[in-house]
Amino acid sequence: MEETFQLLYDTYHQDLYQFLFYMVKDKNQTEDLLQEVYIRVLNSYHTFEGRSSEKTWLLSIARHVAIDWFRKQQTIRQRILGTFDWDTQDVRDQQLLPDELAVQHENVREIYAALDQCTIDQRAVIILRFIQGYSIQETAKALRFSESKVKTTQHRGLKVLRKHMELLREELMDDEVRMERRTDKGVVKSTSGS
């Protein structure tokens, strides 16, 4: 079993890491979730029947681990919202984006923000299809969806992404117009003052 596990690790670790990282967008959390994936693999490898590829099986486990984590986060968030007195406390988000997400290209940041607007299934399909380059058939096998569900989920996810990207671009254009107006006013003041 040790040799088999090592082979699985060597062969698929990077794919699993990328999949989970794009889901949770945090290096430390990704590593924690990977540990959970590997524990589940060790505990259930004897039940693997080979009806799908090992990669498909591993990605399915990773997806379930991510879903469990998101559910747990939602429960924690609801508990906090229910017990915290928001009217009397100064609340600020102290959490910064991980270094891995401080990507230079603005479009990549916009896509990350837009992915947060998608459901877990939409996010998983988009990550597998467009970031990891899976075909519709491979995505269906990995997520244990029908091909039509992959297509529908992909279509809906892309629609959410497109809408969110348009909103972000509108905000950026509004900001640029405001900056131009301020700059124009500053130029007028400095030239009229001489």
From Swiss-Prot:
Cell membrane listed as a keyword: yes
Stimuli inducing this protein: Induced 3-fold by the beta-lactam antibiotic cefuroxime.
Cross-referenced NCBIfam families: PRK09639.1-1, sigma70-ECF
Pfam families, A to Z: Sigma70_r2 (PF04542), Sigma70_r4_2 (PF08281)
One Gene Ontology molecular-function label: DNA binding
Purpose of the protein: Sigma factors are initiation factors that promote the attachment of RNA polymerase (RNAP) to specific initiation sites and are then released. May be involved in the regulation of iron metabolism. Associates with RNAP core during early growth phases, association decreases as cells age.
Keywords: Cell membrane, DNA-binding, Membrane, Sigma factor, Transcription, Transcription regulation
Positions of short motif Polymerase core binding: 32-45
DNA-binding region: 136-155
Name of the protein in its database record: ECF RNA polymerase sigma factor SigX
Subcellular location: Cell membrane
